Amino acid sequence: HLCDRRQRQMCIRDRYLAYAEAANEAWGPKGDNGNGYSAYDVIKAIRKRAGIGGTSDPYLEQCAGDRDKMANLIRNERRLELCFEGFRFWDIRRWKENLNEPVRGIDWDRDGHSFNEFVVEERNYEDYMYYCPIPNSEILKFSNLVQNRGWK
């Protein structure tokens, strides 16, 4: 069934990227702890599948020796590979990135050669919003459960 196959493909990309992120955090860009695949290996395969870095991938090679650079590359790969699939909302919170970054858009001129950038939305998040509220129905079920700080 086509839909099932598409869902598996979407899921496997997330799993590969999650593994790359975890492997980089645990063992660095080229460490694999005996698993056979490092963060570097996984990202190289993902980029190769996308047609990036056929014979060489200078950006990947530049990041291969630095955990922080590799983490940034992996985050960017997640942004690109999983766009419009609902992961970005959770990734930004998990990484504790700035939630108040303005949402920007572009407006192409009629000639198609230039564009103007504009702010679509200004955001006003507070620190407690990194965590979602616990549904009240769950709090009512479990008397020892306390609502996340900042939520009522």
Where are these regions (language model features)?
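Single conserved hydrophobic/aromatic residue that forms the stacking wall/gate
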Residues: 1-4, 8, 12
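Short, mixed-charge amphipathic alpha-helical segments
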Residues: 58-70
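Conserved small-residue hinge/capping positions at short loops/turns
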Residues: 80-84
